[in-house]
């Protein structure tokens, strides 16, 4: 009986390993772009091809949004994924045991995206649910250097095998995926515990006063790449003007400090806001973590649709933050440009949503 059970288990294991091999081969054959296997990981995180652990450059990242597979191959992939989830996933999960639980991120992810996954890993560990970690990805080094405790919930590639439990779920619903208590626990224990970041906060708190306004403007590929612009590009000037009007119902800022990846654009397009308060377009500090510290230190904050800014606002909840304003949309859902969320998943419910003055979408310009 024991020998039979072992034999059956061995056969099942071999079948699933063959399925794993053919799954990876299928991914390679159905992608039309030479780089696309790096991005198109399984939506449930059931496998990760070797190239998914490699660094990608900016042009490759843009390809995620611009490369389109032929309709036939997309249909074949849809059918394959449906069969996989219905009949094979549960058997694969049966073989995956052990205390380690790996969270996967897409190679196009950056710091703001990773923080949601690190927060989930920290929460699972805090509650004793799983020994969870985020799988290492290129570029994480600067984050684990700035916030050393994040290294303790980051798994090296050597820990990721076929038999490792894993999840490809991206926990971005800040009100449902993590409680306020757990969010604040993660920020205190893993971010504010950093001596280097605490020093940055101290410096930036000397830059602001009790009525300072910080405006975080995301530019970059949101506006330089048409396909990405269609998904994320908001009418920044009109939005910032409308947000400032709404803020002035409560307070007139003593000064306005801009944080952006394109401060020159801000100076050229938003300098007229100096009629409300003195504007500072010079970079405060030397790198992105100084920017994050400044956003977190803001008593009053106007955000655009960027996860980096969202995390600055989350951190600010534990500091001297008073009011946060954000656009009423994060992105357009590609499958349905009219899909509209009453609250973008990454936005906190106490943030003030800024609506278009003409009742339009900030991104598409269409009436809602």
Regions found by a protein language model. Give the residues of each.
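A short, glycine/small-residue-rich beta-strand->loop->alpha-helix junction that serves as a flexible
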Residues: 106-116
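Short amphipathic alpha-helix
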Residues: 116-124
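A general structural motif
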Residues: 98-101, 129-131, 210-212, 251-255, ...
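Donor-binding and catalytic core of enzymes assembling or modifying cell-surface/extracellular glycoconjugates
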Residues: 111, 248-334, 338-340
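Membrane-proximal basic amphipathic "stem/tether" segments
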Residues: 5-6, 12-26, 31, 39-103, ...
């Amino acid at each position: 009986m024991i020998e039979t059970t072992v034999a059956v288990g061995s056969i099942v294991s071999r079948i699933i390993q063959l399925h794993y091999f053919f799954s990876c081969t299928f991914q390679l054959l159905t992608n039309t772009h030479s780089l696309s296997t790096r991005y198109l990981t399984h939506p449930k995180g059931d496998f990760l091809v070797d190239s998914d652990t490699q660094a990608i450059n900016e042009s490759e990242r843009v390809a995620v949004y611009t490369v389109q597979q032929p309709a036939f191959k997309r249909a074949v992939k849809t059918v394959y994924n449906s069969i996989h989830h219905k009949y094979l996933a549960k058997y694969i999960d049966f073989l995956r045991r052990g205390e380690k639980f790996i969270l996967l991120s897409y190679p196009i992810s950056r710091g703001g995206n990773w923080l949601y996954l690190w927060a989930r890993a920290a929460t699972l560990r805090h509650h004793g649910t799983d020994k969870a970690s985020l799988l290492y990805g290129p570029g994480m080094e600067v984050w684990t250097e700035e916030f050393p405790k994040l290294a303790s919930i980051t798994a090296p590639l050597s820990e990721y095998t076929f038999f490792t439990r894993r999840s490809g779920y991206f926990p971005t619903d800040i009100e449902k995926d993590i409680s306020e208590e757990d969010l604040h626990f993660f920020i205190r224990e893993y971010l504010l515990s950093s001596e280097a970041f605490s020093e940055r906060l101290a410096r930036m708190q000397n830059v602001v006063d009790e009525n300072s306004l910080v405006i975080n403007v995301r530019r970059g590929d949101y506006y330089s790449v048409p396909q990405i612009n269609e998904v994320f590009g908001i009418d920044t000037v009109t939005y910032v003007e409308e947000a400032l009007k709404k803020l002035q119902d409560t307070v007139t800022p003593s000064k306005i400090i801009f944080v952006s990846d394109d401060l020159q654009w801000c100076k050229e397009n938003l300098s007229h806001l100096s009629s409300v308060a003195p504007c500072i377009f010079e970079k405060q500090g030397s790198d992105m973590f100084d920017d994050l510290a400044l956003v977190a230190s803001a008593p009053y904050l106007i955000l655009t649709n960027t996860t980096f800014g969202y995390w600055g606002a989350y951190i600010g909840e534990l500091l001297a933050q008073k009011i946060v304003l954000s656009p009423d949309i994060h992105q357009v859902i590609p499958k349905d440009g009219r899909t509209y969320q009453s609250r973008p998943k990454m936005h906190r419910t106490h943030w003030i949503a800024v609506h278009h003055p003409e009742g339009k979408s900030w991104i598409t310009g269409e009436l809602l």
